[in-house]
A protein has these predicted regions:
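A cross-family phosphate/adenosyl-ligand binding-site feature
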Residues: 2-56, 61, 66-71, 123
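YjeF_N-associated NAD(P)HX repair module
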Residues: 53-151
């Protein structure tokens, strides 16, 4: 989005030192080098109150969530759901809080206007257009053999 001249802010719900996966840490390191992207950390949602957003991209939780959504994630989802954004809310792969296999939601779930999911439609998503909004399926190059053996 920054490459298209848009103002981009990435909000990390926590501290960079607490990032657990090597991949996430590597990606965060790349973001830190980008002058065109503003970074906010710490999970203090009050930091967002003075910012204006055209669109929110939800990437809080992914497809593997289980159990109750803990803080600060639950409050971040509530923040998204109580705001109005000119460009709406776009969920990456699945709205945070939605079980993509069953369509069930946890105690909170992002209400997206658009969901861009990858590889194939998740079984539970068409049942929940109320939280997924318009759904787009984008191919990411997963070969059939990988789907048979892994998925």
């Amino acid at each position: 989005m920054a490459g298209y001249g848009l103002n981009v802010t990435v909000f990390l719900l926590g501290e960079p030192d607490n990032i657990r996966s090597e991949e996430c840490s590597w990606n965060w390191g790349l973001l830190e080098k980008m002058k065109s992207v503003k970074l906010l950390t710490g999970g203090n949602l009050e930091d967002l109150n003075n910012l204006e957003f055209g669109v929110i991209v939800d990437g809080i939780l992914g497809t593997g969530i289980a159990g109750e959504i803990r803080e600060p994630h639950a409050s971040a989802i509530e923040f998204i759901n109580t705001q109005t954004f000119a460009g709406g809310v776009v969920a990456i792969d699945v709205p945070s809080g939605l079980n993509p296999d069953t369509g069930e939601t946890n105690q909170v779930c992002v209400n997206a206007n658009i969901t861009v999911t990858f590889h194939r439609m998740k079984v539970g998503m068409p049942k929940r257009k109320d939280v997924c909004g318009e759904i787009f399926v984008e191919k990411i190059g997963i070969p059939p053999e990988a789907e048979i053996d892994v998925l």
